[in-house]
Regions:
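Conserved pre-ATP/AMP-binding loop-to-beta segment of ANL
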Residues: 3-20
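Conserved AMP-binding A3 loop
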Residues: 16-43, 50-52
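Conserved S/T- and glycine-rich ATP-binding loop of Class I adenylate-forming
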Residues: 21-24, 57, 72, 112, ...
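AMP-binding/adenylate-forming
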Residues: 35-40, 56-121
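Glycine-rich helix-loop-beta junction characteristic of Rossmann-like nucleotide cofactor-binding loops
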Residues: 47-51, 129-130
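Gly/Ser/Thr-rich phosphate-binding loop
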Residues: 125-183
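Conserved ATP-binding loop and adjacent catalytic segment of the adenylate-forming AMP-binding
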Residues: 159-203, 209-216
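Conserved ATP-binding/catalytic segment of the ANL
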Residues: 206-256
């Protein structure tokens, strides 16, 4: 699917888009998802990462899958400058930050989403590795991040914030993020505020995310869940409000 194809589908009269599930919660199958829920998912991620209108987003994943579609939807929801390149194992090859699709992006790409293999390949080429440090927020999904790749990412210089995602097609991309590098690096996934998590008797993760999925989802991932204290900061009319709240987070222990 091309970008033009997806935008045509997005802008048609239907309130739904066709996607195909990944098989995380059962046998892969086609499903129709509501555009408003995709916008909800986009808004949640953009708010979490602090993305704002005029920031840039790199589309380097196939639009045949939910991850690529959601990059476009985030750019629509938050009025981001979309940088579209052909899906490949080297997404940053031949990118000039002074002239991206005819626009100077001030020396950085604000947001990018990649699969682990794209990240690994990028790190093997010095020029591409250098460009990666000019990405402000990188989310990695669609596969496991092995220990050696995670260690290499933690050693990257610059101000890049790198996140591992947890989610599936049914949740319209991710419902939780885990910081890989920096002072906030952790092995625990932090669900978004609108997401509730629990476990089955077998220890499998149960997801209740009504803004993005109408049904409660039972996954095949065996997890450990713990509570932690979180200092929530909200800013209204230039006045900051601090609130200490108790939240749940999880880490993956295995598969059923």
């Amino acid at each position: 699917m091309t970008l033009e194809d997806f935008l045509s589908e997005w802008n048609n009269d239907s309130d739904r888009v066709l996607v195909h599930t990944s098989g995380s919660t059962g046998k892969p199958k086609p499903m129709m998802v509501e555009k408003k829920r995709m916008l909800n998912s986009a808004r949640i991620t953009c708010d979490f990462l602090g993305l704002k209108p005029g920031d840039s987003a790199l589309l380097c994943m196939s639009l045949d899958y939910i991850a690529g579609k959601m990059v476009v939807v985030r750019s629509i929801e938050r009025h981001l400058h979309l940088i579209s390149v052909s899906p490949s194992g080297h997404p940053l090859k031949n990118i000039d930050l002074k002239d991206v699709n005819g626009k100077d992006v001030n020396g950085e790409i604000t947001f990018a989403a990649m699969v682990p293999m794209q990240v690994y390949n990028t790190l093997q080429v010095p020029e591409e590795r250098e460009l990666l440090t000019h990405v402000r927020h990188l989310i990695i999904g669609g596969g496991a991040i092995d220990a050696s790749l995670e260690k290499e990412l933690q050693a990257l210089p610059g101000n890049i914030a790198i996140w591992s995602t947890y989610g599936m097609t049914e949740t319209l991309s991710h419902i939780a993020l885990r910081r890989i590098n920096g002072a906030e690096a952790s092995e625990w996934y932090q669900p978004f505020d609108s997401v509730k998590i629990s476990q089955t008797e077998e220890g499998c993760l149960v997801i209740d995310a009504p803004l993005v999925c109408a049904e409660t989802l039972v996954t095949n991932d065996i997890v450990e869940i713990e509570s932690y204290i979180y200092n929530k900061v909200e800013k209204h009319d230039e006045v900051e409000k601090n609130e200490v709240v108790e939240k749940l987070r999880f880490r993956i222990k295995g598969r059923k």
